[in-house]
Design a protein with these regions (language model features):
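Sec-dependent N-terminal signal peptides
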Residues: 3-13
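Lipid interaction determinants
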Residues: 17-85, 96-157
Length: 157
């Protein structure tokens, strides 16, 4: 009988301890606010200020810098300004978002728009999923299902 009570106590303590280690995340609340994000690739940089709001919408503005190769080892650095709005939600530790409006403006080589329109690179009304790799009070690391991850830092305005 003594052994049974020891085993039952061990099982009880084991389940209590494992329950205490389980962290319940409220991503919907933690993600609210203003974030500065950066996404860097060779020949591509994006910087964005995005605000996630309680009503499930977001708005953002930022800059995209792209190095277009004109000929071998000769690149043209093109700067684009962008503003956008959309909706967001959390599903299974993933940030699901959709762009419903975007405006992209070529800031320094507008003649290039005749050959390449950056605005066409953004899909409207298509949901995208990004895995929330890390989310803390002031930092988030997201990994899109289509590529490498990027990071954002929370800012107070």
């Amino acid at each position: 009988m003594k052994y049974i009570s020891v085993i039952l106590t061990a099982i009880f303590l084991s389940t209590s301890a494992s329950g205490a280690l389980t962290v319940s995340r409220d991503y919907e609340t933690e993600i609210l606010g203003n974030w500065i994000c950066k996404d860097l690739w060779p020949g591509y940089s994006a910087f964005e200020m995005i605000r996630y709001k309680k009503d499930g919408t977001w708005n953002s503005f930022g800059e995209v810098i792209v190095d277009f190769e004109l000929e071998e080892d000769n690149y043209l650095k093109v700067r684009y300004g962008a503003v956008g709005t959309g909706i967001w939600e959390i599903q299974d530790d993933n940030l699901i978002s959709m762009i419903d409006y975007v405006k992209v403006t070529n800031r320094n080589h507008s003649w290039l728009d005749e050959y390449f329109n950056m605005q066409d690179q953004f899909s409207l009304n298509d949901k995208t999923s990004e895995e929330i790799v890390v989310l803390s009070d002031n930092y988030i690391n997201l990994k899109p299902n289509t590529g490498k991850g990027y990071e954002c830092y929370k800012v107070k305005l």
